[in-house]
Amino acid sequence: MAAMGGWAGIGEMLVAMMPEAVPPLKAVLKDTGVDANDDMMMIGAVKPPKEHAFVAAHQFRWLLSQVNYPKLGDLCWLVIPCALTALDHWSPDVKEQGMISFMHIAKNVKATELSLYEDAILDACCHNIPADDELWYRVVEVSVLLLTCTQRSNPRSPWYDRVLSEMLGHLERQPLNKERRVAWLTLIGPVFDSMGLFLLAHFRLLFSLFFQWIHADDDRTVLLVLERVHTVIKLTWIRKSPYTSRYRNYDTSYRYLLFLHLLNLEASNSLYLYLGWWMSLFFCIKSQPHGRAVR
């Protein structure tokens, strides 16, 4: 069929068809979505059955998945508004198709091509963080991917702070939900790596959750918590100091200091004591004669 139409392949044929195929799908998603303002204006109007939204979302996701880099970048103006409409839909199934669509977009489009839409996309991700359990894994997955894709070179971006704060606040309200914590601990690593030292601003909530989860009765949670604690300490540990060489060769003392550090955090759960501990450690190391270990 593609050859008969003069196209080199199916992908090229779908690219040509997108401008005609996507707008009707978006219209169905919009008409079946929940919007108070639209409901006031559409009293007495005939809306498509909700099943039409499911079909439209799956059709859009399939069409999108057939177009890859670099052709997809030229269609951002068309596909991103439709994916946002799916993401804002009331139906979990439609939302999931929107999330899958955005993951495909993020993997096949340059960050510069997403720059015009990044605020709207990340805002939609934040609004979907309090999603149902069935969608939580997808929510975290797409939020982490889009956040690191669009803000990768800017750890000072307010979006890092907002997205992580939303996630931590939501997890704080459901600390015993095993599925949510395991999914979050599994997927959040790239955000930690991108934020680096700016994780300090989130230590109060972060370590509060870590020390609740470290006592969980499932081994997977405990192992994931230990991995994330190791990542956080590695990213925020004192480095490039003239005094670090004085204890670099004392592995036992280093481990003991790390042990005391974790005990202090668990006992106090206080950001102020944590910062005070770092300052005390710094001045303790500074005052040591050269060649002696910190004890």
Where are these regions (language model features)?
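Eukaryotic acidic, Ser/Thr-rich intrinsically disordered low-complexity regions
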Residues: D133, L258-R295
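Short coil/turn segments at helix-helix junctions and helix-capping linkers
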Residues: E12, I43-H52, P70, C82-Q97, ...
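Hydrophobic alpha-helical segments
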Residues: F198, V232-L235, R239, Y250-H261, ...
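Eukaryotic alpha-helical scaffold "rod" segments
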Residues: L14, M18-P70, A83, C149-S157, ...
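Core helices of alpha-solenoid repeat scaffolds
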Residues: G6-K26, G33-D38, Y69-P81, E113-D123, ...
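HEAT-repeat alpha-solenoid elements in large eukaryotic scaffold proteins
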Residues: M1-M4, V46-L64, V79-C82, D93-I105, ...
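Helix-rich alpha-solenoid scaffolding regions
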Residues: M1-G5, I10, L14, A21, ...
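Alpha-solenoid helical repeat scaffolds
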Residues: Q66, K107-T112, T148-S153, D193-S194, ...
